Design a protein with these regions (language model features):
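Helix-terminus/linker motif at the lipid-water interface of multi-pass membrane proteins
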Residues: 24-42, 109-111, 172, 231-271, ...
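N-terminal membrane topogenesis motif
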Residues: 1-27, 77-84, 210-226, 473-484
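Interfacial segments at transmembrane-helix termini and the short loops linking adjacent helices
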Residues: 40, 105-124, 256, 318-349, ...
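Interhelical loop/hinge segments that connect adjacent transmembrane helices in multipass membrane
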Residues: 1-7, 175-182, 194-234, 282, ...
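Signature of the first transmembrane helix
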Residues: 3-65, 94-102, 127, 158-162, ...
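Hydrophobic alpha-helical transmembrane segments
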Residues: 118, 122, 151-202, 218, ...
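Membrane-proximal transmembrane or re-entrant/amphipathic helices at the cytosolic face
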Residues: 442-484
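Specific pore-lining/lateral-gate transmembrane helices of multi-pass inner-membrane transport
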Residues: 73-88, 261-374
Length: 484
């Protein structure tokens, strides 16, 4: 069985643990945006708070997932000891930061413009602490090739999360608690992770190695900075809307209203992000495990080529079927932002390619380049949002995201060629992307009033595109899958 086939199989299983749970979580948008639950300005507060959470989570992990993969796969390494070292570092950082947030929750709440709601900060601090404590155990499941266990843990958690959201917001809803239910549901659902990894966590003992621990921190902190910059790129546009959107830009509506619309439509673009995440979970340990193979450059190039094809299918399928996907957003007032979804889908496609290209600085121990490239992305994000938001509102934020991720991808590719020669099929990849965009533009320019006819036509377009790609790629794909 070929290595790519193995990777594809693991990606499917990680999809069960990432795409399905996050897609189910995505369906919660329908509940949260219902007119009887949260108005756009309330949903905007949720969007803002989880944006801060994503940034802090990256700091808590401190790049230890990737550091664990790197040090545990070195020749002669003791995987169990490396695991304990990584877990010790993460827990030490997480307890310190989460404890500080809890101790000063009221002050933090005032700082982020939710004065009087310090309990939200406390909820989020505990949620982030539990996420961090189980992050390395989940990474270990990936390294030990246990994607089924990974999937079970994620699926049960999301099942609890959905059930609790439905119970709190439909059965036992109290308007005085409001958005607090969302954080409370996350907190209770996360407690399952502690039970799921109870044996691993109870067996863990803090350990420090005066040689390996500093080396892991030195390797991991550029990864953390890269991740922090990456999260900033992803989340900054949402926070920037709150700060830089001119008053009354959307007539009669607040910045929180615009942020709510933008955040809800962003969720549709997360369909691409889910596929990227599932692939990354399988691919990252795969790249490290196959780094010593002489044929690895050609292997990595083929993997990226097929990855781009799959992403193009997602881009096409979602972009020309927004008349169906819009119903996931609940109240019709959220639909006004649907036109930004294709822009964000394309942005996430570039982000996925960037993750593939970034293998060169991880395998050559030049992780500082990841920091340099992503900090450049942050600067691009800040400037683009500053220029575009006052002129185009949340559409400007969408274009800023695309400009950032595409620029990072280009920089990573150009610099990486100097250190690790990987024969990526850049021309073929770009051709597929351009063809997809042309089809999206053409199809969306055609107005079909009958919804059933429109949906059928769109499905035929997607199926036809997939068949054409299959006939173009069938020979090389069969050869690839047949290789040992």
């Amino acid at each position: 069985m070929s290595k790519i086939r193995n990777l594809a199989g693991e990606t499917v299983l990680y999809g069960l643990g990432t795409i399905i749970p996050r897609f189910i979580n995505f369906l919660l948008v329908r509940l949260h945006t219902d007119e009887s639950v949260f108005a756009p300005d309330e949903y905007g507060v949720i969007t803002k708070l989880f944006a801060y959470t994503a940034v802090i989570n990256t700091i808590l992990l401190f790049g230890m997932e990737t550091a664990y993969f790197r040090f545990a796969t070195k020749a002669g390494a003791d995987e169990k000891r490396v695991f304990r070292l990584a877990q010790t570092i993460v827990i030490a950082i997480s307890v310190a930061i989460s404890g500080g947030l809890i101790a000063f929750s009221d002050g933090v709440a005032s700082l982020i413009n939710i004065a009087g709601n310090g309990q939200y900060v406390t909820y989020l601090a505990i949620i982030m602490l539990t996420d961090a404590v189980v992050a390395i155990p989940f990474a270990r499941l990936r390294l030990l090739k246990k994607p089924l266990m990974f999937a079970i843990g994620k699926l049960v958690n999301i099942g609890l999360l959905v059930g609790l959201n439905v119970y709190f917001l439909v059965v036992a809803y109290n308007p005085e608690i409001g958005i607090g239910y969302v954080f409370l549901a996350n907190l209770i659902a996360n407690s399952f992770y502690l039970l799921f990894f109870a044996r691993t966590l109870l067996q863990w003992r803090p350990v420090f190695d005066r040689i390996v621990s500093p080396a892991m921190v030195q390797y991991g902190y550029p990864i953390m900075l890269t991740g922090l910059a990456g999260i900033t790129n992803e989340m900054f546009s949402r926070l920037a809307l709150d700060a830089w959107l001119p008053e009354n830009f959307y007539e009669g509506q607040s910045a929180d209203y615009a942020l709510g619309i933008f955040g809800a439509c962003y969720k549709l673009a997360m369909l691409m992000s889910l596929a990227v995440t599932a692939f990354r979970y399988a691919a990252e340990p795969f790249f490290f495990s196959n780094a010593a193979d002489k044929q690895s450059p050609e292997l990595f190039a083929r993997i990226n080529h097929y990855f781009v094809i799959v992403c193009c299918l997602i881009l096409l399928g979602v972009s020309i079927n927004l008349d169906i996907f819009k119903y996931f957003l609940g109240d019709a007032q959220y639909w006004e932002g649907l036109y930004i979804v294709p822009i964000l889908l394309l942005a996430y496609l570039f982000l996925g390619v960037y993750y593939n290209f970034s293998v060169w600085f991880k395998l050559t121990d030049r992780t500082y380049w990841g920091t340099i490239i992503t900090v450049a992305g942050v600067l691009i994000t800040v400037v683009a949002n500053y220029v575009l938001i006052p002129r185009y509102g949340y559409e400007g934020s969408s274009w800023a995201t695309l400009i950032c991720y595409s620029s990072m991808t280009v920089i990573c590719y150009l610099v990486g060629r100097r250190y690790l020669a990987i024969p990526y099929n850049i021309g073929g990849n770009l051709l597929y992307v351009m063809a997809t965009l042309l089809i999206v533009y053409t199809v969306n320019s055609v107005t079909i009033t009958n919804s059933w006819v429109a949906s059928t036509f769109h499905m035929v377009v997607v199926a036809s595109f997939a068949l054409i790609v299959f006939f173009i790629e069938r020979k090389s794909f069969r050869q690839t899958m047949a290789n040992k």
